[in-house]
Regions:
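Extracytoplasmic/lumenal domain signature
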Residues: 63-77, 107-129, 158-190, 223-259, ...
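Repeat-blade elements of multi-bladed beta-propeller folds
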Residues: 42-46, 84-106, 131-158, 191-216, ...
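C-terminal segment of N-terminal export signals and the immediately downstream linker at the start
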Residues: 3, 24-47
């Protein structure tokens, strides 16, 4: 583009500027036929379940990128100063539709070719919902056969929407809404819980992370769960703070596991659907700057965890920081990559940390 765009100023004005070329080459004047087999869509938070964040499309390249023009702009219109709002979502595109979350955690569905608003969903219109300003990084798109659903986390709730109409899928949870503070295997009274990154779609399940904060306030642990994508029934749970008798429980001295929180998956998860493996990165145990009341290595805080996506069984883990008191939580979802090791190519997991890769 000839002119620079100040993203912060745009977002303050309540505008989500979607440069259409990023999502579909068919909506810019430079378009030409894509390479055979090339994916035209961005259906997951990280483009694909393995979080490559890479598109193989070749229509836009070094020779023509300077000629791009804005195809359309969508204004969300719900930014505010009180409460202060921000927008952190990565819009996804599936079946020619762009889905995004807004400053007030609404969901907007747009025609990818024109930017026309197809439908919107406001969580505050659902019973017992209060104002929903907050952070969300993306929605989750799930499809099996002719069924297509959008899963939208809003703080401690998850909404299940028909991807075509934006209406609540009433058979899921309680009228299309799932309370994420339930079925958590601990007393959640007075504990904070928040899901800011999208869940992961796998077979007929939705895999969910999240958790409580890492500060001094009482917070929930970051247990990882699987829910039936149609009914909302819990399928399995993995305790990121192990319960007595579980692997890693000996890394928490005494009863510290009972009162500690954090060890959350706030940055998102990745999936190898072919192998059926789920990869999660976790944050610090709470309180993240004091560990005197939680002596030990504190598994599975500050860890990359590989789970059987069908059962929740731990396959392996790697803890990047033992007994964290420096807030060295893992700030990104794991990325599944191909790497060369000892002369051969292997499947590997790359994890960004606050101290390097």
């Amino acid at each position: 583009m000839a002119q620079s765009i100040n993203r912060r100023n745009i977002l303050k004005q309540g505008t989500a500027s979607l440069i259409a070329a990023r999502f579909s080459s068919s909506i810019v004047s430079l378009a030409r036929p894509a390479a055979k087999g090339a994916s035209r869509e961005w259906q997951c938070y990280g483009n694909d379940p393995g979080a490559s964040r890479y598109s193989p499309l070749k229509q836009i390249n070094r020779s023509n990128v300077s000629k791009l023009k804005v195809a359309w702009v969508h204004r969300t219109g719900d930014a505010s100063q009180r409460p202060a709002t921000t927008i952190e979502c990565t819009p996804i595109m599936a079946d020619g539709v762009v889905y995004l979350s807004t400053c007030q955690l609404q969901v907007h569905a747009l025609d990818a070719a024109t930017g026309k608003l197809l439908w919107s969903f406001d969580p505050t219109t659902v019973r017992r919902r209060r104002g929903a300003a907050g952070v969300n990084r993306a929605v989750c798109y799930w499809r099996q056969g002719n069924e297509r659903r959008i899963f939208m986390p809003v703080k401690d709730m998850m909404f299940c929407l028909d991807a075509t109409t934006g209406k609540l899928a009433l058979g899921f949870g309680d009228g299309g809404v799932l309370d994420l503070k339930e079925n958590f295997d601990c007393d959640m009274t007075g504990l904070s819980f928040n899901l800011t990154s999208p869940p992961v779609a796998y077979k007929d399940m939705i895999l969910v992370g999240g958790g409580g904060g890492e500060g001094p306030e009482p917070a929930a642990p970051g247990h990882i769960r699987a829910f039936d994508a149609r009914t909302g029934k819990r399928r399995w749970i993995f305790h990121t703070i192990p319960h007595p008798g579980e692997f890693g429980s000996d890394t928490w001295e005494g009863d510290s596991w009972k009162h500690a929180g954090g060890t959350n998956n706030w940055a998102g998860m990745s999936l190898d659907a072919e192998k059926g493996w789920l990869f999660a990165s976790t944050g610090s145990p709470s309180f993240d700057f004091y560990g005197g009341n939680r002596k030990g290595a504190n598994l599975f805080g500050n860890s990359v965890i590989a789970l059987n996506a069908d059962t929740g069984e731990r396959l392996w883990h790697f803890q990047t920081t033992h007994h964290d008191v420096l807030d060295y939580d893992l700030p990104a979802q794991p990325a599944l990559v191909k790497a060369r090791h000892n002369g051969r190519q292997i499947d590997a997991v790359a994890q960004v940390t606050k101290t390097g890769l």
